[in-house]
Amino acid sequence: MSSQADARRITAPQIQARKGGEPIVSLTSYHSHTARLLDRHVDVILVGDSLGMVMHGMETTVPVTVEMMIVHGRAVVRGTKRALIVVDLPFGSYEASHTEAFHTAARVLKETGAGAVKLEGGRRMAETVRFLVDRGVPVMGHVGLTPQAINTLGSFKARGRDDAEASIILDDARAIAEAGAFSIVLEAIAEPLARRITQEVAPPTIGIGGSPACDGQILVLEDMLGLGDRVPKFVKKYANLGPDIEKAVASYADEVRARTFPAAEHTYAPRLVEKPAKAS
């Protein structure tokens, strides 16, 4: 593949066309530096409202604002050339009406340069999804555990582990699919349910605590790098950077206190200026 082809930005329709094909690789990112590192290796980068908890120390995603999503979304877009960038619509920015949802989504896309938005909810949000898609906004759905609803759910525990709840989530996924979502995130649901949804809906599914049968997978970058304090069951740590960072900081602190840093190679010598020769 040519370098020119490599530089082309992946689009929502291209992700939608991946149903049943090569698995879709997704991760979160909240700033340009990590986004740049991810860009060559992933298909989708989600600027998730999880940034409230990961980057800003919030207890839940509920306090996250549209302005926060735009700032982080813009940074991620700047750091990438290839991956599809999807930005979460935060709690309270799209639920009241279809018009509110469109204005928020349009603002996010225009001010960040992202290629799609994501919103949470099943049947209750299906008409909103349809309204957005009909007006040119690519929408990624999200069913199962929906963190924005934590105050009504009561916990971050897995969903769909009994027949009644599984039936509700299945109907939610069907509704979002029929409304035109180009993909659907399945978060923290029973594996057989994730497998069944993947088999039954037309858009590709992206699992996070779902099933290996999903059409793709996503994780929070900081969790898989070993930087998260509370790591869910569905996370595999591919690195353990937390202790490495702490060790590096401790070494730096020791050297500063011992005045061994900065050493000579880290400092600048004065520029020597040759004096003009004296006339004889």
Curated annotation (Swiss-Prot):
<feature type="binding site">
    <location>
        <position position="49"/>
    </location>
    <ligand>
        <name>Mg(2+)</name>
    </ligand>
</feature>
<feature type="active site" description="Proton acceptor">
    <location>
        <position position="187"/>
    </location>
</feature>
<keyword id="KW-0566">Pantothenate biosynthesis</keyword>
<feature type="binding site">
    <location>
        <position position="120"/>
    </location>
    <ligand>
        <name>Mg(2+)</name>
    </ligand>
</feature>
<comment type="pathway">
    <text>Cofactor biosynthesis; (R)-pantothenate biosynthesis; (R)-pantoate from 3-methyl-2-oxobutanoate: step 1/2.</text>
</comment>
<feature type="binding site">
    <location>
        <begin position="49"/>
        <end position="50"/>
    </location>
    <ligand>
        <name>3-methyl-2-oxobutanoate</name>
    </ligand>
</feature>
<dbReference type="InterPro" id="IPR015813">
    <property type="entry name" value="Pyrv/PenolPyrv_kinase-like_dom"/>
</dbReference>
<comment type="subunit">
    <text>Homodecamer; pentamer of dimers.</text>
</comment>
<comment type="function">
    <text>Catalyzes the reversible reaction in which hydroxymethyl group from 5,10-methylenetetrahydrofolate is transferred onto alpha-ketoisovalerate to form ketopantoate.</text>
</comment>
<feature type="binding site">
    <location>
        <position position="88"/>
    </location>
    <ligand>
        <name>Mg(2+)</name>
    </ligand>
</feature>
<dbReference type="GO" id="GO:0000287">
    <property type="term" value="F:magnesium ion binding"/>
</dbReference>
<protein>
    <recommendedName>
        <fullName>3-methyl-2-oxobutanoate hydroxymethyltransferase</fullName>
        <ecNumber>2.1.2.11</ecNumber>
    </recommendedName>
</protein>
<dbReference type="InterPro" id="IPR040442">
    <property type="entry name" value="Pyrv_kinase-like_dom_sf"/>
</dbReference>
<dbReference type="Pfam" id="PF02548">
    <property type="entry name" value="Pantoate_transf"/>
</dbReference>
<comment type="similarity">
    <text>Belongs to the PanB family.</text>
</comment>
<feature type="binding site">
    <location>
        <position position="118"/>
    </location>
    <ligand>
        <name>3-methyl-2-oxobutanoate</name>
    </ligand>
</feature>
<dbReference type="GO" id="GO:0003864">
    <property type="term" value="F:3-methyl-2-oxobutanoate hydroxymethyltransferase activity"/>
</dbReference>
<dbReference type="InterPro" id="IPR003700">
    <property type="entry name" value="Pantoate_hydroxy_MeTrfase"/>
</dbReference>
<feature type="binding site">
    <location>
        <position position="88"/>
    </location>
    <ligand>
        <name>3-methyl-2-oxobutanoate</name>
    </ligand>
</feature>
<keyword id="KW-0479">Metal-binding</keyword>
<dbReference type="GO" id="GO:0005737">
    <property type="term" value="C:cytoplasm"/>
</dbReference>
<keyword id="KW-0808">Transferase</keyword>
<dbReference type="GO" id="GO:0015940">
    <property type="term" value="P:pantothenate biosynthetic process"/>
</dbReference>
<keyword id="KW-0460">Magnesium</keyword>
<keyword id="KW-0963">Cytoplasm</keyword>
